[in-house]
Structures are given as structure tokens and as C-alpha cells.
Amino acid sequence: MGMVSEFQQFAIRGNVIDLAVGVVIGAAFGKIVTALVEKIIMPPIGWAIGNVDFSRLAWVLKPAGVDATGKDIPAVAIGYGDFINTVVQFVIIAFAIFLLVKLINRVTNRKPDAPKGPSEEVLLLREIRDSLKNDTLKSG
């Protein structure tokens, strides 16, 4: 079997296609969560604690300046505000995945309904058994 045909069989399998669909949907969901966090969740939180824009929060290690030749030197800073936004995004995505997995587990682990009574085969086998018992008792 050639390499191309092996790859085609691999790529056409349902699991690979499902994975690809999951990656695309996950990327789109990530963008939605990013917009939710940056545009809807964090602004009211920032407003509540004093008009703080979390995306701009940083610890400046070295302020921006100009060197002797007049060239701008950018500031050196640790942008912890973006980190806070990313953590909030992660928590939202993790919670959504948790709920999805919980739902999938509930659906797949559903116990089948208990049978309402013995099947026709079982009833027939019982009749045969009882008939054989009666025949052996009569002949014995």
C-alpha cells in the first residue's frame, strides 16, 4: 500500500475529521470567549475597582526613554493585566468544557431501561425446562 493511499485512509476516518471539526470550532469558541472577557466581563470589573483597564496593567521595570542619539528606548514591563485576562478566558473555557463533558457523560452513561419482563425466548426456555422436569418425574 502506497504512502498516499495510507494517508487517504487515515484522513478519511471519522476520528480525524471529528478532530479537525473540533479544532475549528474550538478556535472560533476561543475568539468568542476572548471577546466576552475583554469587552463584556473585564470592563465592568475594571470600572468597579476604579476605572482600571486590565489589558494595560503592568509593572514597569525600566521606563521608556531616549538614548544619547535621540533614539526611543521602549519600556521594559511585565504585563500582568493581559495575564489576568488570559486566566479569566481559561477559566471560562475550562468551565464550558467541563459542562460539555458532563453532558456527554450523562448521555453516554445513561443506564438502559430495565426490561419489563422476561423475553419470549426466556419464557419458551422455561416452558421447555418445566416440560422436561415433568417428563423425568413421570418416567422416574
Curated annotation (Swiss-Prot):
<keyword id="KW-0812">Transmembrane</keyword>
<dbReference type="GO" id="GO:0005886">
    <property type="term" value="C:plasma membrane"/>
</dbReference>
<dbReference type="InterPro" id="IPR036019">
    <property type="entry name" value="MscL_channel"/>
</dbReference>
<keyword id="KW-1003">Cell membrane</keyword>
<comment type="subunit">
    <text>Homopentamer.</text>
</comment>
<dbReference type="InterPro" id="IPR019823">
    <property type="entry name" value="Mechanosensitive_channel_CS"/>
</dbReference>
<keyword id="KW-0472">Membrane</keyword>
<comment type="function">
    <text>Channel that opens in response to stretch forces in the membrane lipid bilayer. May participate in the regulation of osmotic pressure changes within the cell.</text>
</comment>
<dbReference type="InterPro" id="IPR001185">
    <property type="entry name" value="MS_channel"/>
</dbReference>
<keyword id="KW-1133">Transmembrane helix</keyword>
<keyword id="KW-0407">Ion channel</keyword>
<keyword id="KW-0813">Transport</keyword>
<dbReference type="Pfam" id="PF01741">
    <property type="entry name" value="MscL"/>
</dbReference>
<feature type="transmembrane region" description="Helical">
    <location>
        <begin position="16"/>
        <end position="36"/>
    </location>
</feature>
<protein>
    <recommendedName>
        <fullName>Large-conductance mechanosensitive channel</fullName>
    </recommendedName>
</protein>
<comment type="similarity">
    <text>Belongs to the MscL family.</text>
</comment>
<keyword id="KW-0997">Cell inner membrane</keyword>
<dbReference type="InterPro" id="IPR037673">
    <property type="entry name" value="MSC/AndL"/>
</dbReference>
<keyword id="KW-0406">Ion transport</keyword>
<dbReference type="GO" id="GO:0008381">
    <property type="term" value="F:mechanosensitive monoatomic ion channel activity"/>
</dbReference>
<feature type="transmembrane region" description="Helical">
    <location>
        <begin position="84"/>
        <end position="104"/>
    </location>
</feature>
